[in-house]
Amino acid sequence: MVVNIEVFTSPTCPYCPMAIEVVDEAKKEFGDKIDVEKIDIMVDREKAIEYGLMAVPAIAINGVVRFVGAPSREELFEAINDEME
C-alpha cells in the first residue's frame, strides 16, 4: 500500500522549508512506498479548507492531518511506518 503524504506550505512561512526537507528525506528513504504532494495554500486554498487547516506547515498522511508544524525526521518516519502496518 502506498502512503499518501500531503505537505501544506505557503511562500511566506518561515518553518515550511524545514517541513519540506523532512518530507524530501522520507521520499529518499521510502521511495515508491510513499507518494508526496506539496500544496501551496496560496494556490490551492480549497484543499487546506477541506482539512480545516489554520496554520502551515501541516502534513496529512492518508487523508488525516498528523502534524501542524515541522515534525522531526523520527516523528515523520514513525508516522509513515504506522500507516504501512
Curated annotation (Swiss-Prot):
Coiled coil: none annotated. One of its GO terms (cellular component) is cytoplasm. Residues 2-85 form the Glutaredoxin domain. Disulfide bonds join 13-16. PANTHER family: GLUTAREDOXIN-LIKE PROTEIN, GLUTAREDOXIN-RELATED. Belongs to the glutaredoxin family. Acts to maintain redox homeostasis; functions as a protein disulfide reductase. This is Probable Thioredoxin. It comes from Methanothermobacter thermautotrophicus (strain ATCC 29096 / DSM 1053 / JCM 10044 / NBRC 100330 / Delta H) (Methanobacterium thermoautotrophicum).
